[in-house]
Structures are given as structure tokens and as C-alpha cells.
């Protein structure tokens, strides 16, 4: 399984996507909990 999509490995894309999703969800819940998310 050495097939890569262009120059970026698939596992790297998955890792970055996972971090971004977790970060966005964390920011959303933190903003909602602290009251800053009411303006979004």
C-alpha cells in the first residue's frame, strides 16, 4: 500500500483532518459553554 495521492500521504491527510475536526468541535463547545458562542 505505497500508493499516495500526489505528494501527500493519505495518513497525513487523515491526521490533519481529525485534528481540525476535534479542534473545531472543541472550540464550538467551549464557546457555547463560556457564552461566547451565542453570537455565532
Swiss-Prot record:
Pfam families: PsbJ
Transmembrane region(s): 8-28
UniProt keyword terms in alphabetical order: Chloroplast, Membrane, Photosynthesis, Photosystem II, Plastid, Reaction center, Thylakoid, Transmembrane, Transmembrane helix
Keyword Transmembrane: yes
GO biological process: photosynthesis
Superkingdom, taxonomy of origin: Eukaryota
Localisation: Plastid, Chloroplast thylakoid membrane
Membrane-topology descriptor: Single-pass membrane protein
Keyword Transmembrane helix listed: yes
Cellular component annotations (GO), alphabetically ordered: chloroplast thylakoid membrane; photosystem II reaction center
NCBIfam families noted in UniProt: PRK02565.1
Subunit structure: PSII is composed of 1 copy each of membrane proteins PsbA, PsbB, PsbC, PsbD, PsbE, PsbF, PsbH, PsbI, PsbJ, PsbK, PsbL, PsbM, PsbT, PsbX, PsbY, PsbZ, Psb30/Ycf12, at least 3 peripheral proteins of the oxygen-evolving complex and a large number of cofactors. It forms dimeric complexes.
Family designation: Belongs to the PsbJ family.
Chain's role: One of the components of the core complex of photosystem II (PSII). PSII is a light-driven water:plastoquinone oxidoreductase that uses light energy to abstract electrons from H(2)O, generating O(2) and a proton gradient subsequently used for ATP formation. It consists of a core antenna complex that captures photons, and an electron transfer chain that converts photonic excitation into a charge separation.
HAMAP family: PSII_PsbJ
Record's protein name: Photosystem II reaction center protein J
